[in-house]
């Protein structure tokens, strides 16, 4: 159907059915070609692995060198040639004193590290408290009535504004018993109205 300007109206857009959409989603589509070829990617990965391996080897060599230098400065070789018995005893006493000193230093360092760890934990806890990220306690489920809930929400106005029982229809027990007495036995009422009550007594007698 053409509009007033003479141009043809575009065809209505047809919605894909579920089967067609499923087929369209599962069928293979042409993938975009990447700018780097597969062989180039493999070459780059291999080069990166080689560089990482060289860096690890260099770090290991540096660690071994630092360890050797530290041991050479702290553990000097002993000169035991030409020493007598008393001199050897003096050397042993010196070595024991040095060991005791190193143990004291190690103990002091461990105490400082423990103190720093405790202070860091306290500071982190203070930060969490300031941000409000404290551990919430587990809440217990408490049963509460509707009146208590409304009173907690509205305060003293709860009883004045909302009285849920006042809108309910009240049925008295006396009214129900009165209705039952008025209805009685429906068969007797029908016999009395139709005049069949006397004839029924003759047949029964």
Curated annotation (Swiss-Prot):
Residue numbers marked as site, Involved in TNI-TNT interactions: 75, 92
GO cellular component, one term: troponin complex
Region spans: Disordered: 1-38
Modified residues (Phosphoserine): 5, 17-18, 37, 39, 72, 145, 194
Record Pfam families: Troponin, Troponin-I_N
Residues modified to Phosphothreonine: 26, 46, 73, 138, 176
Region spans: Involved in binding TNC: 27-74
Segments of this protein annotated with the region Involved in binding TNC and actin: 124-145
Modified how: Phosphorylated at Ser-17 and Ser-18 by PRKD1; phosphorylation reduces myofilament calcium sensitivity. Phosphorylated preferentially at Thr-26. Phosphorylation by STK4/MST1 alters its binding affinity to TNNC1 (cardiac Tn-C) and TNNT2 (cardiac Tn-T). Phosphorylated at Ser-37 and Ser-39 by PRKCE; phosphorylation increases myocardium contractile dysfunction.
One of the record's GO molecular function terms: actin binding
Matches recorded under Gene3D superfamilies: 1.20.5.350, 6.10.250.180
Function: Troponin I is the inhibitory subunit of troponin, the thin filament regulatory complex which confers calcium-sensitivity to striated muscle actomyosin ATPase activity.
Annotated family: Belongs to the troponin I family.
Subunit text: Binds to actin and tropomyosin. Interacts with TRIM63. Interacts with STK4/MST1.
Protein name (database record): Troponin I, cardiac muscle
Organism: Equus caballus
